[in-house]
Swiss-Prot record:
Organism whose genome encodes this protein: Xenopus laevis
Region (Disordered): 91-115
Lineage summary: Eukaryota, Metazoa, Chordata, Craniata, Vertebrata
Protein name: Ciliary microtubule associated protein 1A
Alphabetical list of InterPro entries matching this protein: CIMAP, SHIPPO-rpt
Residue ranges of coiled coil: none
Alphabetical list of PANTHER family matching this protein: BOREALIN N-TERMINAL DOMAIN-CONTAINING PROTEIN-RELATED, SHIPPO-1-RELATED
Amino acid sequence: MGTDLWVGTWRPHRPRGPIAAFYSSPGPKYSLPGNTGFVSHDPSRHRAPAYSMGNRRFKLVDDCSPGPGYLVPSNITVKGKDGTPAYSIYGRPRDISSFRTPGPGSYSPERAGKSAYRSAPTYSLGERTKTFGNDQTPGPAAYMLPSVIGPRIVNRSSAPNYSMTGRSKIGSFHEDLQKTPGPGTYRVIDPGTYKHKPPQYSMTARNVLPGDTTIKPGPGAYSPEKVVMSKAQAPNFSFGIRHSEYVAPLIVDVAD
């Protein structure tokens, strides 16, 4: 093939890096866990032991035990302090003051007055107490006792009582004899109450038997001439477009 077919300086060459349009699947979008290191290692792969170099441990400077911090005097033995007793000079303590009992002159019998002698009662005028107006004790008028007059008392015997009403027209001198009730005025009891009751029937609307109310297709609703599935049929072809292999799927959310 000569170089006359190519126009310009562009020539077919291998791409330097992967082109996303070459892949129909997300492909490199998913980051698989690595097989090296300790962090984010693939759990389905064997992981070799990993070692790290750290700094040197510091030696504890502060000792928790008292150690030689105690200053034991030289005259202290297992039985106590050894040596002669030592004394120190200190001031004299103060004497405790004695209780001063009151004498006869401390009392004033003349001031006893009402406490030691009989005296007449004395009264003083003061203002009215505040609790007097808020006394909630009910008085005699607060109780609603039932009346003892009339026949409404169940535990008391009541005398006969009478009431006055108007004069009845029945049997009086001005009774209208033309208003005698006729046969239609009386309410006749149904004989079926106290005699043998015959059967009773009522007429109602015709009941429709339950069934399927959907519309069933008739013979004219079918088109047997349009059925081609039961007959031999030639293959059918359709014209479509050719999809490019460089069309990449739409990736909206891409993790950084």
